[in-house]
Amino acid sequence: MEQEYHIGIDLHKRFSQVAVLNKEGEVLDNRRVDNDPPLLLQHLSPFPKETPVTLEATIGYEWMSDLLAGNGFKINLANPKKVRLIAEATIKTDKVDAVTLAQLERTNFLPAAYLPPPEVRDTRELLRHRMKLVNLRKGLKNRIHAVLAKRGVLFYPVKDIFGKVGREFLSSLQLPSIYRKEVDGYLSLIDQIDFLIKKREKEIKSQVVKENKEAQLLLTIPGISYFSALLLVAEIGDIKRFPSPKKLASYTGLTGTISASADKTYQGSLKKDSNKYVRWILIEAADHAIKKDPGLFAFYRKIAHKKGENKARVAVAHKLLISIYFMLKNNQVYQLRKPSGKPLLCHGRQ
């Protein structure tokens, strides 16, 4: 009968601590191994395929996961935040190391984290990069606005000063040399980022399936663009992994809004250790959604009056997230609502 093993790996930048336990939990080996793929595979070569290997979902886990999964090991990903709490309660230690990870997996107490398939992870990376470039561009544009404000240029004759006509306006401004060079430098960077964004978008359109039914559903939400819809689908993954809207809200960090009744709404703080990409998209979309959805606009005004505009935007983002949960679960398009909360348009199912 083949011996049963449980392996835990505490991943560091240059090395990993690798612990091997037997079926009874006895530590057979616990040593430091350099993060060199051939060395790691050589060290693990005595163990049979499908041997469970547990890693924490920390920065840089992907290469290790791919390496070991590609060589027949069964990968388990642990939730870093929860693993310490469970370790304290079950095996009486607050030290999360390779042995701890292996013990938690062996005893079925491991708090698992979602392990996306490589193709989903690659799609996320592609879409996240585009989003980061868009944010960089937005930051540079804000810097130009700040420079112009320093020189008393507070009002513009055009709506978009970064379009063709707007660029002509910027070129015509009589700015001192130091400010002119600053504006021109930022514009040059914006042009470079524009090029990279277009290049990324071309790659996304060629690599990500255009007929993504889930993304098409999310496009019916006011304020959600094509690329935002794709990123939401990639970040959320299979909606079935969330048993309730509350679990999805916890995953995205939009748990601060709790409707106690029709008349009371509590606004708490956002969870920082959560999916910031989904959270960012929905908070950005909230501004557009309240302009299109009468029900959301009424809700926004009510919260803004009591708690302020920023918390109202987060509350709207939370409502959008709950809608997304049921849209994906039930294959439904988005429904606009009357100020009373009742459906304004009923699209039914697709």
Question: Which residues fall in each region the model found?
Answer:
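Glycine-rich, often acidic, oxyanion-interacting loops/wings at catalytic, nucleic-acid
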Residues: 131-217
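Short glycine-rich, Thr/Ser-proximal phosphate-binding strand/loop in the N-terminal lobe
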Residues: 17-38
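Phosphate-backbone recognition surface of nucleic-acid-processing proteins
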Residues: 217-220, 226, 230-310, 344-346
